[in-house]
Amino acid sequence: MVRGSAKHEARRLRMAASLTELTTEAEKHGITVVMEEFDNLTAPYSRADELMWFMRHVPGLRCGFDTGNFLYNEEDAVKSFSLFRPYIASVHCKDRAFTENAGSPCVTVANRKLYPVAVGDGNLPIEKMMRVLLDSGYTGSFAAEHFGSIEQLKCMERSAAFLKRVLGEK
């Protein structure tokens, strides 16, 4: 679907209407609905500006901030983080590396390959983003994600150690 076309806009408006119904019902039950930027051009929320459109047009919708997805569209994760900070209700800590490994790469819109790595082992300033959130009083979750890794256990162990260190846990 071509962005900016009448068909694309109609689809986006239908999604916003459905999400508004969902967030309204969820709120009655104490549930927070989150949406994250998705690293695939078929989604009408794969870029920061598109996801922000939903944040601004769907009452009660919050951001599930995925640290690694903005690189797909060659967007700056830190700049996007600053933009979405007031909306963030949960964080997927997904690190990416430009160094080739055995994992399945995600290919960016600029045809660069991003490889899955343990949180803290890649090119993203995840610790910096976490500390800014924590310093602002954030009490939501930080989940490690290693989409495409063939070494899930190793990545999870390294990611857990990284997250515990940043969170000050033993």
Kindly label every feature range from the protein language model.
Residues 137-147:
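Short helix/strand-capping connector loops at secondary-structure junctions
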Residues 15, 33, 66, 91, ...:
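Conserved, mostly hydrophobic/aromatic
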Residues 8-11, 15, 80, 118, ...:
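Residue-level preference for long, well-ordered alpha-helices that form the structural scaffold
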Residues 152-170:
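C-terminal helical cap(s) of enzyme catalytic domains, especially alpha/beta-barrels
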Residues 1-63, 83:
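Active-site acidic/histidine proton-transfer and metal-coordination neighborhood
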Residues 44-48, 52, 69-138:
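Gly/Pro-rich active-site loop or hairpin
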Residues 21, 54, 132, 162-165:
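A generic secondary-structure signal
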Residues 2-3, 38-40, 66-72, 94-98, ...:
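Active-site beta-loop-alpha junctions enriched in small/polar residues
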